[in-house]
């Protein structure tokens, strides 16, 4: 099985699993249908499964057209009335089998109130939608900042070699903010320089080990990150207080 990011909109990735022997493909968060239909038809593949992480349109917008094209396609997603056409509603603690893959469902609210992620422990793959980005994290919409903080703490506990399949190409912009928070972080500096050598390349998947070294939202226990937060109005150096300031500062960062 091959994993391929199919681009959608300006910066979305639709992560796609391709099994050419079986003649099928599966995808995560198809915000647009056309790129999937084109790819499937050009490779003579049938869409078997759709995995959804949350209700935002740039993640579910293609579902209606895709299930019209492939009516037998299974659609997994969180229990949320804002998402239509989910054939298999799922929640924390359940598992989903996609071909030979067995995904554990992780409940990760914060970005939205019902956000979930798909974790495949045997392969070490995490499909985390908009909860975790490389060097960043999602904004808070209808979830809470406390929930988002807890969701990222959960990701910190995953094995360090876990590959992180984020839904957006935000890495370089996130690194610029990370460099503002930790200007002496050599991992951030080196990664920025690496990306600048191939600025149009896909930076994903990332991995937990890398994120622990570059992502300020996973580094709230580090002294320089705490000092940044305290200098920008944090009530204390407690992890949640630091996280709140980081998220607020990132919201207006340009």
UniProtKB/Swiss-Prot annotation:
The keyword Metal-binding applies. GO terms for biological process: methylglyoxal catabolic process to D-lactate via S-lactoyl-glutathione. Keywords: Hydrolase, Metal-binding, Zinc. It is an enzyme of class 3 (hydrolase). Transmembrane segments: none annotated. GO terms for molecular function: hydroxyacylglutathione hydrolase activity; metal ion binding. Zn(2+) 1 binds at residues 54, 56, 111, 130. Gene3D superfamilies: Ribonuclease Z/Hydroxyacylglutathione hydrolase-like. Binds 2 Zn(2+) ions per subunit. Its EC number is 3.1.2.6. It catalyses: an S-(2-hydroxyacyl)glutathione + H2O = a 2-hydroxy carboxylate + glutathione + H(+). Its cofactor is Zn(2+). InterPro entries: Clx_II_MBL, Glyoxalase_II_hydrolase, HAGH_C, Hydroxyacylglutathione_Hdrlase, Metallo-B-lactamas, RibonucZ/Hydroxyglut_hydro. Pathway: Secondary metabolite metabolism; methylglyoxal degradation; (R)-lactate from methylglyoxal: step 2/2. Zn(2+) 2 binds at residues 58-59, 130, 168. Thiolesterase that catalyzes the hydrolysis of S-D-lactoyl-glutathione to form glutathione and D-lactic acid. Monomer. Belongs to the metallo-beta-lactamase superfamily. Glyoxalase II family. This is Hydroxyacylglutathione hydrolase. The gene is gloB.
């Amino acid at each position: 099985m091959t994993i391929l990011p199919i681009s959608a909109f300006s910066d979305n990735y639709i992560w796609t699993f391709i099994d050419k022997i079986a003649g099928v493909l599966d995808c995560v968060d198809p915000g647009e249908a056309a790129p999937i239909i084109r790819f499937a038809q050009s490779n003579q593949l049938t869409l078997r499964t759709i995995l959804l992480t949350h209700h935002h349109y740039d993640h579910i917008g293609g579902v209606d057209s895709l299930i019209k094209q492939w009516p037998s396609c299974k659609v997994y997603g969180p229990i949320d009335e804002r998402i239509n056409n989910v054939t298999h509603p799922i929640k924390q603690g359940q598992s989903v089998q996609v071909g030979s893959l067995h995904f554990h469902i992780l409940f990760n609210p914060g970005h939205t109130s019902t956000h979930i992620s798909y974790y495949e422990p045997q392969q070490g793959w995490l499909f985390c939608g908009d909860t975790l980005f490389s060097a960043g994290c999602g904004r808070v919409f209808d979830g809470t900042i406390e929930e988002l903080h807890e969701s990222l703490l959960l990701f910190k506990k995953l094995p360090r070699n876990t590959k992180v399949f984020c839904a957006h190409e935000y890495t370089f912009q996130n690194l610029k903010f990370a460099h503002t928070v930790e200007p002496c972080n050599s991992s951030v500096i080196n990664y920025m320089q690496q990306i600048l050598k191939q600025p149009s390349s896909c930076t994903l998947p990332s991995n937990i080990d890398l994120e622990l070294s570059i992502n300020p939202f996973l580094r709230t226990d580090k002294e320089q990150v705490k000092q940044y937060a305290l200098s920008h109005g944090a009530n204390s150096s407690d992890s949640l207080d630091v996280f709140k300031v980081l998220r607020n500062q990132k919201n207006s960062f340009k």
